[in-house]
């Protein structure tokens, strides 16, 4: 079975990319157990709780990330450099447990996947 990586690199609520990526991730989890989630660049904002998408007339899908464990999606990485660049602390309580990785280590980890889907 192919190893699949889902990379979230866009901020939530500005486009439908994050919501569509999450939908694709949950659907793919029914077909394979070998998938991992990466949060890089502005995608790190997908991990923050307390967002108010109704202010921009968007649907609040961020809470759905909390369901990843129910779908047996347990491997989540977040780019430590992306967190620093955006003034976020790796100790921030995220909506899912994501392990910080430096950019070089994250690239090496991504190289282990057969398919990389970016949202």
UniProtKB/Swiss-Prot annotation:
Pfam families named among the record's database cross-references: DsrE (PF02635)
Localisation: Cytoplasm
Chief location bin: cytoplasm
Entry keywords, A to Z: Cytoplasm, tRNA processing
Record text on subunit structure and interactions: Heterohexamer, formed by a dimer of trimers. The hexameric TusBCD complex contains 2 copies each of TusB, TusC and TusD. The TusBCD complex interacts with TusE.
Name of the protein this chain belongs to: Protein TusC
Coiled-coil stretches: none
Family: Belongs to the DsrF/TusC family.
GO cellular component: cytoplasm
Biological role: Part of a sulfur-relay system required for 2-thiolation of 5-methylaminomethyl-2-thiouridine (mnm(5)s(2)U) at tRNA wobble positions.
GO terms (BP aspect): tRNA processing
Highest taxon of the lineage: Bacteria
